[in-house]
């Protein structure tokens, strides 16, 4: 066991970085290093890399299968190729395990385990005979059980690697990585042959008990660090990447909420929207809308762990409807879900009604999404009483998203409920069941209208139980 130096692969979500790959056609045409960036060494690193996110999980079982082709052509005498998986939490601590093939030593392949916690890295590379560090297999199946901060590794069902302890207990994502490290200074994206990339080919990566879906990710194009295949870069949907936006100072001249909400960057990942409230943003399929979730702590929001579990169930619902994990399908699902709960979240009879549904597009087909099935996915089969309203506290994560959709007339307001409570037309976008507004973003009259709508809704519910009902929000002014 010894210390090692962490080298970042520089995951990026900027559209500009994707565009820079188009002109990165030789080592001499590499984009300039960012200001302040210091290269860790003189090696060039090229990556095949994918990522999968899942709800915060303490214990996992990971099985990595790798095919080794030691005689592959194209490697230089000093090249090294490794394939591995990397478990990571939200603060960047990680555990990595895999196999590294070193070209100068034809029979030398190293099984390595690494942990990187709080800025300090430790690596274990003991070989199967504990002295030479050598492996020489045609294929590897690495089984790793991570339980309560301890990783136990078994290779090809026979050899047990040294345990790694002191690991985090809050894993939220996993990376699948094949990496080429070379002294060749003339490398660039797209210059690698299939045989060179296939020296340590990952055949499969299984994770339990969570369900995962891998997607290609973008790396910042640097002269000595980049995505190995240009097609992987081009396959990344533009709508899933961020577009830098100018910082607009707070206006005192009556700027409305719509303008304030539009000057943000874009993404379409529901998990990130929940995980980074205050920085969470979402771009819908037509790339017109931008929403910034308010950075406030409030116990009226569902706890993040539960919210991410709901997100996983919603993803499964999309798959069951013939959709996929693409930004377009997930964006369509989010819009449809919001529309359903704007219209039907306060209905008196929450049992199934055929009319409580909306039509959307999933998997390039028109499908119906019903209020009952989305509500069931959110509740996860738990219909008993709880100290909070699970549906409402989950949907509050999408409050500002909903307001922008209503302002842009992308969804319909609940006209019957609004008319029943006498909500003036100009306050329509701000008065719905799960609206939760931040006074940094909205003028006083909007905040007052929202507060009064909440008060009238509560009062109406109480009065109904006594045989009377309030009909106009203005009655309480």
Curated annotation (Swiss-Prot):
Keywords: Capsid protein, Virion. One of its GO terms (cellular component) is viral capsid. InterPro entries: Closter_coat. It is found in: Virion. Pfam families: Closter_coat. Minor capsid protein that encapsidates the 5'-terminal portion of the viral genome. Belongs to the closteroviridae minor capsid protein family. This is Minor capsid protein. It comes from Grapevine leafroll-associated virus 3 (isolate United States/NY1).
């Amino acid at each position: 066991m010894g210390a090692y130096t962490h080298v970042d692969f520089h995951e990026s979500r900027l559209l500009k970085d994707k565009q820079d790959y188009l002109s990165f056609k030789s080592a001499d045409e590499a984009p300039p290093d960012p200001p302040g960036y210091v290269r860790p060494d003189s090696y060039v690193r090229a990556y095949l890399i994918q990522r999968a996110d899942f709800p915060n999980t303490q214990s996992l079982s990971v099985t990595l299968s790798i095919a080794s082709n030691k005689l592959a052509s194209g490697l230089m005498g000093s090249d090294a190729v490794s394939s591995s998986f990397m478990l990571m939490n939200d603060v960047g601590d990680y555990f990595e395990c895999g196999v590294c093939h070193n070209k100068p030593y034809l029979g030398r392949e190293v099984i390595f385990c690494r942990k990187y916690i709080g800025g300090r890295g430790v690596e274990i590379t003991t070989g199967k005979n504990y002295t030479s560090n050598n492996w020489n297999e045609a294929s590897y199946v690495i089984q790793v059980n991570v339980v309560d901060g301890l990783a136990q590794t078994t290779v090809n069902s026979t050899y047990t690697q040294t345990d790694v302890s002191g690991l985090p207990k809050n894993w939220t994502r996993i990376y699948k990585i094949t990496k080429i490290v070379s002294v060749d200074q003339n490398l660039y994206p797209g210059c690698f042959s299939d045989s060179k990339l296939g020296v340590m080919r990952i055949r499969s990566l299984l994770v339990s008990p969570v369900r995962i879906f891998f997607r290609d990710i973008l790396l910042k194009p640097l002269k000595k660090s980049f995505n190995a295949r240009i097609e992987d870069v081009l396959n990344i949907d533009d709508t899933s990447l961020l577009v830098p936006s100018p910082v607009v100072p707070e206006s005192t001249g009556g700027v409305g909420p719509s303008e304030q909400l539009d000057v943000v960057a874009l993404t379409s990942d529901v998990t990130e929207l929940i995980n980074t409230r205050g920085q969470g943003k979402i771009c819908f399929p037509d790339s017109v809308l931008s929403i910034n979730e308010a950075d406030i702590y409030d116990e009226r929001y569902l706890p993040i762990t539960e919210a991410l579990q709901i997100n996983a169930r919603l993803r499964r619902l999309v798959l069951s409807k013939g959709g996929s994990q693409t930004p377009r399908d997930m964006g369509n699902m989010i819009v449809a879900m919001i529309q359903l709960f704007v219209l039907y979240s306060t209905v008196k009879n929450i049992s199934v009604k055929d009319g409580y549904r909306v039509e959307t597009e999933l998997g390039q087909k028109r499908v119906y999404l019903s209020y009952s099935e989305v509500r069931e996915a959110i509740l996860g089969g738990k219909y008993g009483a709880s100290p909070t309203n699970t549906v409402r506290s989950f949907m509050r994560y999408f409050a500002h998203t909903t307001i922008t959709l209503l302002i842009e007339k992308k969804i319909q307001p609940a006209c019957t409920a609004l008319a029943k409570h006498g909500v003036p037309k100009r306050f329509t976008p701000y008065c719905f069941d799960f609206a939760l507004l931040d006074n940094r973003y909205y003028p006083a009259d909007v905040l007052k209208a929202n507060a009064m709508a909440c008060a009238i809704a509560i009062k109406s519910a109480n009065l109904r139980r006594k045989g009377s009902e309030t009909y106009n929000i203005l009655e309480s002014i």
